[in-house]
Design a protein with these regions (language model features):
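A short glycine-rich, Lys/Arg-flanked "PGG" loop and its adjoining helix->strand segment in the class I
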Residues: 148-160
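Core SAM-dependent methyltransferase catalytic element
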Residues: 215-235
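Conserved beta-strand signature within the Rossmann-like core of class I S-adenosyl-L-methionine
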Residues: 161-168
Length: 235
């Protein structure tokens, strides 16, 4: 099920909670959505090897009860994570800001449910509760000031003790403008000690951590250090 205007579907079921004190300050993510609409399936061509994401997705799938409801936050094309979780027998709800990405995810993972939505709308439209969350390279698309709010929102949308697999690129940047596959996107990152603290402060226990040096296939994207955290929601 795809949204039609980037603002979710239906009427909000409840007022925002984790985001209620967030100062939007005229923030506009239309440029982010347009960039990924333009990139489309070239994203998977630029990042063909996703060993870290696949391994972390496998950990998540193994932690879930049978037929669990899982949120894929920033699902992109649905590959590999949404497909991996669906093939493991789980019910996948994927969201992405890009309508083109949502369309590709629907084609790649016909058993999943996908919506064109912003991250904060998961709470606004009460999509949970979820049995688990995958957040691979989605939180880095937010300014640093918003990331703790997004993590607290995920904490509220998860059942107690539920697993979360997430990844970020290690970098000390905030809302940094980056050329990316012929477009420009804005990204944020942390050095790993600060990232761990931000995640813990949002109410998560970190159960495991892996890092990978990654060189994308496209010369338009610089090499990066990818950090994968395996987490669990604390009460």
């Amino acid at each position: 099920v795809s949204g039609t205007d980037g603002t979710g579907e239906g009427r909000p079921k409840s007022k925002a909670r984790a985001y209620k004190d967030f100062d939007w300050g005229g923030m506009d993510r239309a440029g982010q959505a347009a960039a990924f609409d333009s990139i489309g399936d070239r994203y998977d061509e630029a990042f063909p090897h996703k060993e870290g994401q696949i391994a972390s997705g496998a950990w998540l799938a193994e932690q879930l009860p049978a037929g669990a409801h899982v949120l894929d936050l920033g699902c992109g094309t649905g590959l590999p994570t949404a497909r991996q979780l669906a093939e493991a027998g789980h019910r996948v709800t994927g969201i992405d800001l890009s309508g083109a990405m949502v369309k590709l995810a629907e084609e790649n993972v016909p058993d999943g449910e996908f919506r064109r939505m912003d991250i904060y709308e998961v709470e606004r439209y009460d999509l949970g509760p979820f049995d688990g969350v995958a957040a691979f390279f989605s939180l880095l698309m937010l300014p640093r000031a918003e990331i703790p709010y997004a993590l607290r929102m995920l904490h509220q949308q998860l059942r107690e003790g539920a697993p979360m697999a997430m990844s970020m690129v290690e970098a000390d940047v905030d809302d940094f403008s980056l050329p990316f596959l012929g477009n420009t996107i804005r990204v944020s990152g942390y050095l790993r000690d600060e990232l761990r603290q931000v995640v813990r402060d949002a109410g998560f226990e970190i159960c495991g951590e892996d890092s990978y040096a990654y060189a994308p296939a496209s010369t338009d994207v610089p090499p990066e250090i990818q950090i994968f955290l395996q987490c669990r929601r604390r009460p």
